[in-house]
Amino acid sequence: MDHEERRQIAMERIDTILIAAETDGSLMYPNMRDWNNVTFHPGYGLLPVNSPKVSQLSGPSLGKFIQILEVMRNLILTNRRTTKRDIFYQMFVSCSSQQEVDRLVSVAVAVLQVPRLILGVMATSKGLVVGDLRYTNSEGVVVDCSLAVGGDAIPQDVTSLSHILTSANFILVVEKDAVFQRLLEDGIFSGCLPSLIMVTGKGVPDLATRQLVHLLSSQFKLPVLILTDCDPYGLEIFFMYKYGSLAMSWAAEPLAVSSSVWLGLLPSELSVLDIGNSSMKPHSDMDTRKMMEMSKREYLQLESENEGLRRELEIMWDIGRKAEIQQIVEMRDDGFLAQEYLPWKISRCSWI
């Protein structure tokens, strides 16, 4: 299905929903926080089930949702694009916050089940990329990411990139910007590592960051190595790249990179790195609930090759504490992370 066909389908679905919502005075939409509403397909990631549990929009919230659908309809008709921030400025009288707009846009994507860019809505990209990568952006400018000091901003519309070139051997995804910048300062590109592309989503990755990682991995068959903190939320970020996210499973857009591996910081290596309990924070109640919930996910239960991940999650539980990559940096202020830890792990394929 090409782009124009998707736009036409989106228009038809918007018109149908607008009529139904105005007639019924309410709208049922999939509950995007319920893991029972998605199923795991190996090689693709998360997909919605046929009969999901639903929530309801009515009253003022429904009115705001209809406004957003009308904005999307106009964007498709005029073949224009806007950001969620711009939508908030258009609706600031009726919407109390950016978060409310973001939620209603997510509801629209879930109900329509089409990629957000088809609807003409982009999010401001926060991710960075640096390394062996060149491309031409939507304005015809050639961007050489090897020249970026501190990293180039990932474009909002990754689908518009052309003439993409790289001779990298792999993609290194770093959870936090502080670690990303420290690796640059410590000469990760001047050491003994093979040619690479380094990406950070600055925490939870946005859509553009995930699109870029998926695009580069699929187009150039590049392995994706992911470096996160050793805590439940670092592991969640790894799962997001590898299997997809709960919220975006409704968008009919492949974003998961099933070949991704967890490079570190692994629970099983904390003792080897001599990170003592006194320097690690204990798990919070929220951390504990997160680990319990993750352990029940379908992709951890179904995939035989996930024995290693299940074991690491058990070790994380047993340790009862969490460690940040920044602690390694502070313990060894001699470029250890860039010049020793990463080269050693990558050369020995020491990942999960």
What residues fall within each predicted segment?
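Nucleic-acid enzyme cleavage-core boundary/entry regions
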Residues: 1-225, 232-352
